[in-house]
């Protein structure tokens, strides 16, 4: 399945009547231990599954297990390699505790290999193990087997989303009665043969990397303009089992065929021989050494004669630290292509998602099929899909549009859609149906905020939509501070050379922007994710004011974005600045005297090149940096050059180079990094120099310094590094009891080193330069460094860090040396 930073999952579940008026079914389950009947020793990694379903678990290293369901299932199947499978019947509608399930050893011959029940974790040996030898044989030749990329291969992909176990009694529940029409749309899930309500269908036909046709129907189309497609594609990617690391559901898993980790990360067991497409294959079972690690359980089917991977079937252990995913399994079958390499015949991914475990879940099935023959030139669009679709649509899949039409007639459904649109986009449509809204009000997150200069800041704004014009747009706002009593404003006219579906920031962008504004800002503050006046970036008005300034701007900007993820920005701008808060400017005279500067002007012309190879297109109004954008693995490079003239006397050139990259450490988490270096080439006064981005609010904002005051440092040459390591629970998952909280560790580092050359150093008394402002200092030979240690995934979305400043600490109070910061991050 694919999804919109789980926002789609929340939407689909909330939109279903089960989220409003569901009577939670009783629980049937069991807790206990699985042991060897002869020795009484626990059997680690045994599988405990409810018969007729995918609901189950893997027992831990001590043989303990806990499993439950709300679907009325009462029969458990318990098994492990080398043991006879045992069927156990439970008492319905209760949890059976302290169970002791004894498995009887089994002995059977497989070719020349004898498999017995002595496969406990403490007895497992990699030496003289035929299963390990067989895996090593496949790994050694995997480059010869790996499927090759074929630019002419036609591939069909199909994704369905459905509300799982949709078996409500509509007649007996008054709240559900108005949704009784849903019964005629109920289908059967291929995953577990349960009743489901299919709410989304997506089909794609590709030739190599070129997409030939795409078709989608269902509820998610109502949210398409907020970036849904990119997130759907990010969650469901085509995996390669031969890679060392598998990218799945926005996480990284160690492959059972990893050249570096497979044998040490997994235990392998030969289980049986089976026939697949007429070939005898060894059925090889594998389980992770540590059940909390990001790995798989499952089977590899390897041909007996050629030791070629014929098929694999893998699933994710329920103990790992993943959010919102209750079941996840994959199955892929291969054929041998010309040249001896493998070719994928078809691959299936099945998943079930949840918001709250006691609610109905979201079922997803993603299928990828290799097509024989045909050509993308024979037809186009939907007709091409109809001609080449390998599996016919079910009767219920063909009427999803009718389902949506009927749902739109229910007021409660429309209200839920409206609420999700507001949360996802930050804007409120001025019509009941966004397809008729000419103007949207927002962003809602900026309507009220706090800061020491303005006090309570009130803001109201919005933008026109493509329903008014698909090329011409306007946006703006008015803001007012209860303390400074100044009216601020912003107005932008946009012409898009490409027609837009709803708003001007949809990819690909090609537009002109003419803007004017007057507002309060922090020098050096240019946060990536949030505006300065976002409610989360507020500072309590009673705190001492920091360095701020009023800025009046008029500018013209041109933006062009290409499919290869190269974009260019060019702009000219006039700005007039007035110091505010704790900021004051003083100009140095010929005799060394200081003259107060109440305001100054700055002209700029600039050009920026941005390149992000592999970055998916994203259509949210916040752009690629939106917190709702799930896919941020692609590297981003920016080269920016600015020509400016400040105070009508200083002409300067400034160059910035910025690189951002996410480094995955296989299943051990990832490190997000950002490197920013630059130089001001000419003499320039203080306001035109570089000052690091600071953020003194309680909220964690990426790529900012949380304990540095605005304009605390200035430089004309600098290099800054931000790095955050998300460990994904690698440590906490191994601590008993703590691991049940699903907490995850975070370690962060922010550092910067810079210098101010003599030509721009006011201490040398150069006429016309500005003296250093109060509280502003220069870098010594020591870089500025702050580090943070935190816990995330609290309640699935909250992050709490303790941040500590390590350098330039002289004279600072305890509060300025460190503190608690809070962030929000919703991940799978």
Model-identified regions with their sequence ranges:
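Short Pro-Gly-centered beta-turn/loop motif in secreted/extracellular proteins
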Residues: 40-44, 66-73
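Structured extracytoplasmic
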Residues: 119-281, 287-295, 356-442, 446-449, ...
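Exposed, low-structure sequence patches enriched in small/polar residues
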Residues: 250-255, 381-828
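Structural motif
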Residues: 27-43
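Short, acidic Ser/Thr/Gly-rich low-complexity loop/linker segments typical of extracellular
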Residues: 54-64
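Hydrophobic beta-strand segments
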Residues: 46-50, 76, 115, 153, ...
């Amino acid at each position: 399945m694919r999804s919109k930073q789980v926002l789609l999952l929340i939407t689909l579940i909330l939109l279903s009547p089960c989220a409003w008026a569901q009577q939670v079914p009783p629980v049937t389950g069991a807790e206990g231990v699985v042991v060897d009947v002869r020795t009484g020793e626990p059997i680690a990694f045994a599988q405990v599954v409810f018969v007729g379903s995918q609901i189950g678990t893997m027992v831990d290293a001590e043989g303990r297990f806990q499993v439950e369901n709300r679907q009325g299932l009462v029969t458990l199947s318990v098994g492990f390699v080398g043991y006879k499978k045992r069927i156990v019947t439970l008492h319905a509608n209760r949890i059976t505790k302290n169970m002791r399930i004894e498995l009887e050893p089994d002995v059977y011959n497989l070719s020349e290999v004898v498999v017995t029940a002595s496969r406990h974790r403490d007895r497992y040996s990699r030496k003289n193990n035929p299963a390990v030898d067989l895996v090593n044989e496949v790994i050694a030749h995997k480059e010869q087997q790996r499927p090759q990329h074929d630019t002419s291969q036609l591939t069909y992909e199909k994704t369905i989303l459905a509300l799982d176990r949709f078996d409500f009694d509509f007649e007996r529940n008054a709240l559900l009665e108005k949704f009784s029409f849903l019964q005629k749309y109920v289908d059967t899930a291929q995953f577990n043969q349960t009743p489901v309500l299919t709410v989304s269908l997506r089909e794609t036909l590709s030739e190599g990397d070129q997409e030939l046709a795409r078709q989608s129907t269902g509820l998610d189309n109502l949210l398409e303009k907020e970036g849904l497609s990119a997130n759907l594609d990010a969650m469901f990617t085509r995996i390669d089992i031969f890679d060392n690391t598998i990218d799945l559901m926005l996480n990284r898993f160690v492959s059972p065929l990893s050249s570096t980790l497979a044998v040490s990360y997994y235990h392998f067991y030969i289980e049986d021989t089976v026939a697949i497409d007429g070939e005898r294959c060894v059925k090889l079972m594998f389980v992770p050494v540590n059940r909390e690690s990001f790995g798989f359980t499952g089977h590899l089917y390897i041909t007996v004669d050629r030791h070629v991977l014929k098929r694999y079937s893998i699933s994710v252990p329920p103990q790992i630290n993943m959010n919102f995913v209750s079941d996840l399994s994959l199955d892929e079958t291969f054929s041998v292509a010309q040249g001896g390499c493998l070719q994928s015949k078809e691959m299936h991914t099945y998943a079930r998602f949840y918001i709250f475990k006691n609610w109905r879940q979201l079922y997803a099935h993603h299928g990828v099929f290799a097509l024989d023959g045909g050509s993308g030139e024979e037809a186009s669009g939907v007709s091409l899909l109809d001609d080449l679709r390998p599996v016919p649509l079910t009767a219920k899949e063909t009427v999803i549009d009718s389902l949506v039409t009927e749902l739109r007639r229910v007021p409660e459904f429309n209200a839920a859609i409206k609420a999700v649109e507001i949360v996802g986009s930050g804007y409120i449509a001025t019509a009941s149906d966004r397809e008729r809204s000419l103007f949207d009000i927002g962003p809602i997150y900026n309507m009220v905020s706090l800061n020491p200069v303005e006090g309570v800041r009130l803001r109201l704004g919005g933008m026109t939509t493509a329903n008014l014009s698909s090329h011409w747009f306007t946006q703006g706002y008015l803001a007012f501070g209860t303390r400074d009593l100044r009216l601020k404003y912003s107005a932008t006219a946009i012409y898009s050379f490409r027609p837009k579906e709803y708003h001007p920031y949809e990819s690909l962008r090609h537009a002109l922007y003419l803007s004017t504004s007057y507002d309060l800002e922090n020098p050096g503050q240019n946060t990536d994710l949030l505006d300065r006046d976002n409610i989360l970036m507020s500072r309590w008005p009673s705190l001492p004011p920091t360095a701020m300034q009023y800025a009046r701007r008029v500018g013209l900007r041109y933006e062009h974005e290409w499919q290869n993820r190269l974009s260019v920005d060019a702009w000219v701008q006039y700005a007039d600045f007035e110091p505010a808060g704790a900021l004051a400017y003083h100009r140095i005279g010929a005799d060394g005297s200081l003259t107060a500067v109440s305001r100054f002007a700055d002209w700029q012309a600039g050009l920026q090149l941005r390149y992000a190879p592999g970055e998916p297109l994203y259509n949210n109004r916040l752009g690629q940096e939106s917190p709702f954008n799930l896919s941020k693995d692609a590297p981003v490079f920016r080269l920016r050059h600015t020509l400016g003239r400040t105070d009508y006397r200083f002409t300067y050139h400034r160059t910035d180079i910025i690189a951002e990259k996410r480094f995955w450490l296989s299943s051990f988490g990832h490190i997000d990094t950002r490197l920013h270096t630059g130089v001001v080439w000419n003499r320039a006064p203080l306001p035109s120099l570089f000052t690091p981005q600071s953020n003194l609010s309680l909220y964690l904002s990426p790529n900012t310094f949380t304990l540095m005051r605005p304009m605390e440092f200035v430089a004309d040459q600098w290099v800054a590094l931000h790095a955050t390591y998300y460990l994904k629970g690698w440590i906490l998952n191994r601590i008993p009891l703590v691991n049940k909280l699903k907490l995850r560790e975070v370690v962060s580092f922010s550092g910067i080193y810079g210098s101010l050359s003599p030509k721009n150093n006011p201490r040398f008394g150069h006429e016309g330069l500005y003296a250093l402002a109060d509280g502003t200092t220069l870098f010594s030979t020591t870089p500025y460094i702050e580090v943070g240690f935190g816990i995330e995934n609290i309640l699935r979305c909250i992050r709490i860090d303790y941040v500590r400043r390590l350098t330039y600490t002289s004279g600072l109070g305890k509060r300025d040396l460190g503190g608690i910061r809070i962030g929000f991050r919703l991940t799978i």
